[in-house]
Amino acid sequence: MKNVALVDKVRNSLIGNDQAMDGPAGPRRITYADYTASGRSLRFIEDFIRDEVLPFYANTHTETSGTGHQTTRYREDARRIILDAVNGDERDAVLFCGSGATGTVDRLINILNLRLPNELDEEYGFTGQISPEKRPVIFIGPYEHHSNEVLWRETIADVVVVEEDEAGLVDLDILKDRLLEYADRPLKIGSFSAASNVTGIITNTDPVTTMLHEHDAIACWDFAAAAPYVPIDMNHPDAPDGPASKDVIFISPHKFPGGPGTPGVP
């Protein structure tokens, strides 16, 4: 009953839930069916921000003022809540960056220093001077959102698409073959969708993550489409130090109910 009450509270707090919109047939009640793209705002979250956060808002780069200290505490509380929600531990970090999953992938690319300035690269052909065996390689799945594909293709890395199996999932046999084919590359990264934002097919992340780690590859998971609907475990509950624990996850919180206005979270 507690969960039912919570769901009812969320549903009844959606801003615009009873809103009408003019159309060719006159005003009609809005039926929102695009949660794959974005969630909608919740009244109790917006009320809390207006009444409890904004009156004390200040720059989080300083704690020398009371308002700066309070705003910084809010931010750090948010980090802790998110870390707990994804079963993170002291080895994991929560970052806030950019817009949605696009901002998170972009941040990881910058951290790994995988991108050259476009204008300089076009003028001097720096990427072409990197021999193939020295290039990083990125393995992606058959149904990636553009944020988990296009950004990787704009780096110095080679992007390898792993085809799907008969069930529409990442084909583990093909993934193993590709990992062996590129075994000598200096940096190997697997970046796969936890769920397709087109078909809704959910990937079993454990065997894919385990296979990536068995071949010394970093395991990244795009939970943009899946996060509002499935549990997320950064560290496998049965073996936190085991091969099924994830290295990086990408979350797009604006897809959650109450999420509009939030940053991406890697």
Where are these regions (language model features)?
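Pyridoxal 5′-phosphate
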Residues: 1-266
